[in-house]
């Protein structure tokens, strides 16, 4: 075997080995590229899913916020309507006059008088009811008209001796009735 043949065999072997290495390298490069493309696709898919989740979450939050805002607006509107109705009722009560006002005031004083037993008692009422109260109080022993109080009408009756104070004003009766019937009033107003 000549030296040229040996050199040629070594070259052929080196070329074959180089081709094999190149082929393996190309295969490996293709595998790496395929893997990188799969990973890139996975990253893009995950980013799209995350973006959709965020969009959905933001939409849900905005929708929830809008619903809450609408509910608060409805509640505020209802509260305003209830306040208007309450104010109208107060105005109607304040406008009660004549025999009806006297009968109501007398009835409220009768109920309050049961709490006092022979004590010296002061009866307070609306300043415009002073004459009315003087006439009614004259029928009760030991009762006298006291200073006016800020109310729609009715009476506040008190005695220093027993430290009892009874608030039978139109205002207090209205508030009791209003609180007891608020649910029904609301249901009737808003057809619930």
From Swiss-Prot:
Q: Does the keyword Signal apply?
A: no
Bias kind Basic and acidic residues: ranges: 8-26, 50-66
Please cite one Gene Ontology biological process associated with this protein: proton motive force-driven plasma membrane ATP synthesis
What cellular component terms from Gene Ontology apply here?
Answer: plasma membrane; proton-transporting two-sector ATPase complex, catalytic domain
Name the UniProt key words of this record, in alphabetical order. ATP synthesis, Cell membrane, Hydrogen ion transport, Ion transport, Membrane, Transport
Q: Which compartments does it reside in?
A: Cell membrane
Acidic residues compositional bias, start-end: 27-49
**What GO annotations for molecular function exist for this entry?**
ATP binding; proton-transporting ATP synthase activity, rotational mechanism; proton-transporting ATPase activity, rotational mechanism
The segments labelled Disordered in the record are: 1-66
Q: How does it sit in the membrane?
A: Peripheral membrane protein
Briefly, what is this protein's role?
Answer: Component of the A-type ATP synthase that produces ATP from ADP in the presence of a proton gradient across the membrane.
Give the multimer and partner information: Has multiple subunits with at least A(3), B(3), C, D, E, F, H, I and proteolipid K(x).
Q: Which family does it belong to?
A: Belongs to the V-ATPase E subunit family.
Q: What is this protein called?
A: A-type ATP synthase subunit E
Q: Which organism is it from?
A: Natronomonas pharaonis (strain ATCC 35678 / DSM 2160 / CIP 103997 / JCM 8858 / NBRC 14720 / NCIMB 2260 / Gabara) (Halobacterium pharaonis)
């Amino acid at each position: 075997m000549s030296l040229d043949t040996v050199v040629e065999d070594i070259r052929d072997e080196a070329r074959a080995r180089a081709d094999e290495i190149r082929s393996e390298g190309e295969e490996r490069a293709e595998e790496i590229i395929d893997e990188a493309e799969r990973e890139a696709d996975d990253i893009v898919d995950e980013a799209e899913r995350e973006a959709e989740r965020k969009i959905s979450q933001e939409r849900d939050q905005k929708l929830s916020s809008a619903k809450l805002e609408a509910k608060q607006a409805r509640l505020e509107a209802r509260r305003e309507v209830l306040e208007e109705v309450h104010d109208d009722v107060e105005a109607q009560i304040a406008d009660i006059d004549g025999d009806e006002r006297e009968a109501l005031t007398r009835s409220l004083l009768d109920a309050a008088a049961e709490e006092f037993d022979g004590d010296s008692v002061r009866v307070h009422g609306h300043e415009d009811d002073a004459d009315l109260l003087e006439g009614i109080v004259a029928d009760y022993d030991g009762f006298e008209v006291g200073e006016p109080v800020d109310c729609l009408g009715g009476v506040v009756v008190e005695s220093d001796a027993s430290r009892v104070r009874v608030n039978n004003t139109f205002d207090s009766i209205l508030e009791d009735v209003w609180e007891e019937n608020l649910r029904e009033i609301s249901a009737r107003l808003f057809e619930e």
